């Protein structure tokens, strides 16, 4: 992701997505949090992507949860692609800052702060480093006097089919993508649901997968995409074009592989290859064998 994208809004910052995450992952599908009850606070949410990677020096997204004009809680979400053994320390700092901010604002009543780690990793589960005491060595006689601090991790790639069905926002599309990627590293997008926040979804996929092919679709001359199926088709077309430009056998083999992954039949593949590469049918059939 380039410098010009640093201040752009991220997917989780949209209230419909944020509320969906809370309701599905925290409240077991009950519509406890409504999008119009959420209000941004404290930080301007952004990807810190100077080198294409996600850098988190500030809390990613923080929102007041309000009923009418009365705030009843503060929610915080941190995006992570890798397990971070220091996350409990970071979360203590974020939550402490949220409470301190309320005191500095001289609020009549301080509301609770609930923070969550949105973990997009697909290689391993977040099975450790979920509490302060896991991260430090404590003298046995001192243990009872050291307060523990636990963090709450939402493992996106391990959401169940039942949880995925409960999603009502673009979070469901993104979550399904990472669930399928965990099960099959070669998975190509095939979700037919319409994407509401196309720009934010594709940028999140690029950052969290480390592959900018999704973001480059935003700047293509072919226009906007509306579903992940269209994203896959656009990637196929891009592969064909690159194959033509390279004019090498590997380009054709790669195109055949991608077309098969998105469900094209051999007859359809033959027609596409003949049309784009201007080859004889017999030659094309050699690549399918």
Predicted regions and their residues:
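A general recognition-element feature
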Residues: 1-242, 288-289
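Intrinsic-disorder/low-complexity detector
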Residues: 213-289
